[in-house]
Regions:
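ATP/Mg2+-dependent ligation/transfer catalytic cores
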Residues: 1-179, 372-433
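A generic structural motif
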Residues: 18-20, 95-101, 155, 195-201, ...
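Short, conserved phosphate-binding/catalytic loop or strand-edge motifs used
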Residues: 130-134, 183-191
Length: 433
């Protein structure tokens, strides 16, 4: 796509990913979108929590007057939105007052890592799979459908109108959805996106989530990517498939039918950095309610061949299909930051020529060779704060700002939690005390 998509529109939706992976947007005229002066967005966007609590940071505060950022459209992402009359959408890169790419912006973080990969002669390709729950609008939040079976033909009757509309919309904006199917649990679904270069894959993931939410709203539904949306409900994760390519060939493939030596170095780098950057895969308090043993959710920095109990599942497959599946992230993940963390970790392994341990051959959780990962947001924040390698992987300024954002999230949670009296406490102590 190009400027033609914008020139044919009356209104342009300028989209920017925030720290939590949501798309913030501004509607402008086509003339404004194409103007060399561009549109602006206040730096406070990176001083907002997911619920829009405001906090100050060195990047945006009363000390510097909360300056503007320049929104520069990435015309490769310009798309007409057929479901919105005379409207196009385009993702934007953000530039600071100094004229440089804004280092805190998730798109900038990923671009920097992807450029590093390109300098080594590789193209990184990623594909995301998202699990989610769809419920009917209303205070009762009744899940879509009456049955809870995975891969259910029966449930497809209930799902089909939403799935078909989703396929149509994604095709219209150039997002290649490979599949949609039911998952275990009432209202639980999964969709998979085809692989693409790292930055494009993140764009696809962020847009697919946002546009699916919009579609569900039009149909009287709500789509939630909350990892555990209510007590007793199944959980939602996000799995990323990844590989490196050079001159049209998959660098993860070995002629002996297994993973190449380079793939094992890349894998080793992800394993040794996983604990440090775990908060980027699981960025919320709720994310850790998903990470329980025995639920196919990885709790160790582990790997195995076609092993779904491990954090990284190696799939040798074929010359075109050899890849690694990273299974740690929750569905609330920011795809830009997760892909940046995975790719940076893998490149670290290649640069240091790290060796991966032998794979887990059974339950990776029970394999004592693999270190445990954070089980709370507080532990994950501490791991990033104490990391010696993360600033080099993702940039000091970004790491410091992201730490601040998660510390704010923790503080707000602890303040709320301190005021709560649980049902368990009430049942146990009300009459006996």
């Amino acid at each position: 796509m190009s400027e033609n998509a914008i020139e044919g529109a009356r209104v342009v939706q300028l989209e920017v990913p925030d720290l939590d992976g949501g798309l913030r947007a501004k509607l402008v005229s086509a003339a404004k979108a194409l103007s060399p002066a561009g549109a602006a967005m206040c730096t406070i966007m990176f001083g907002l929590t997911q619920a829009d609590d405001v906090y100050e940071s060195p990047a945006s505060s009363s000390d510097n007057g909360f300056p503007d950022l320049l929104m520069r459209p990435d015309m490769a992402t310009a798309r007409p939105l057929p479901w919105c009359e005379d409207t196009a959408a385009v993702l934007c890169d953000l530039y600071g007052p100094d004229g440089a790419l804004y280092p805190v912006a998730p798109r900038t973080v990923l671009r920097t890592v992807a450029d590093r990969c390109a300098e080594l002669g590789f193209e990184a390709r990623f594909a995301a799979e998202f699990e989610l729950c769809v419920v009917h609008q209303g205070d009762d939040a009744v899940p879509l459908g009456r049955t809870m079976n995975a891969y259910s033909l029966l449930r497809l009757r209930e799902l089909r109108p939403l799935a078909q509309a989703f396929f149509e919309r994604m095709e219209a904006v150039g997002i290649p959805i490979e599949s949609v199917h039911t998952e275990l649990g009432h209202g639980m679904l999964e969709f998979a996106i085809s692989h693409a270069p790292a930055g494009e894959a993140a764009d696809h993931a962020a847009r697919a989530k946002a546009y699916l939410k919009e579609l569900c709203g039009e149909m009287g539904l709500v789509a939630t990517f909350m990892p555990k949306w209510r007590s007793g409900a199944p959980t939602s994760g996000c799995h990323f498939h990844q590989s490196l390519w050079r001159d049209g060939d998959n660098a993860f493939w070995s002629d002996d039918g297994g993973l190449s030596a380079l793939a094992r170095q890349y894998l080793a780098g992800q394993l040794v950095t996983m604990a440090d950057v775990s908060v980027l895969f699981n960025p919320s308090v709720n994310a850790y309610r998903r990470l329980q043993p025995g639920t196919w959710t990885p709790v160790t920095a582990s790997w195995g061949v076609d092993n779904r109990t491990a954090a990284i599942r190696a799939i040798a497959g074929s010359p075109k299909g050899a890849r690694l599946e990273h299974r740690r992230a929750g569905a609330d993940v920011n795809p830009y930051l997760a892909i940046a963390a995975m790719l940076a970790g893998g490149l670290h392994g290649i640069a240091e020529k790290l060796e991966a341990p032998d794979p887990a051959t059974g339950d990776a959780v029970a394999d004592g060779r693999f270190p445990r990962l954070a089980t709370t947001l507080a532990d994950a924040v501490d791991a990033l704060r104490g990391s010696e390698v993360a600033p080099g992987l993702l940039g000091r300024e970004f790491v410091d700002h992201y730490l601040l954002s998660r510390e704010v999230e923790l503080r707000l949670w602890r303040e709320w939690e301190a005021e709560q009296v649980t049902e368990w406490e009430h049942r146990r102590y009300f009459e006996t005390s």
